[in-house]
């Protein structure tokens, strides 16, 4: 079995409301010097073949109109 990690995040130029909310709260919590926050999600899969993971991302895991994704192979 192969292990794959898919990182999904909003595309550049798309409003990331969660990221903006965290970014706005940081100074009030004493965190200075952090200028840009983007929040996404991580999906980890185990599969016999990873050939169709990109297709899975396009059709189910990510919204290709507003999200980018990156596929990483996880080494044991």
Whereabouts are the PLM-identified features?
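A general secondary-structure signal for short beta-strands and their flanking turns/coil
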Residues: 1-3, 40
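Short, surface-exposed ligand-recognition loops at beta-strand->loop->(often short) alpha-helix junctions
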Residues: 8-17
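Conserved short beta-strand edge segments in small beta-sheet-based binding/regulatory domains
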Residues: 35-36, 63-76
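Short hydrophobic/aromatic beta-strand micro-patches
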Residues: 7-9, 44-48
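Amphipathic, hydrophobic secondary-structure cores in small proteins
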Residues: 31-44
């Amino acid at each position: 079995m192969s292990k794959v990690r898919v990182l999904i995040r909003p595309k550049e130029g798309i409003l990331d409301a969660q990221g903006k909310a965290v970014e706005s709260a940081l100074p009030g919590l004493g965190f200075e010097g952090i200028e840009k926050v983007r929040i996404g999600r991580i999906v980890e899969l185990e599969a016999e073949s990873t050939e169709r993971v990109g297709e899975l991302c396009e059709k189910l895991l990510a919204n290709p109109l507003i999200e980018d994704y990156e596929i990483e192979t996880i080494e044991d």
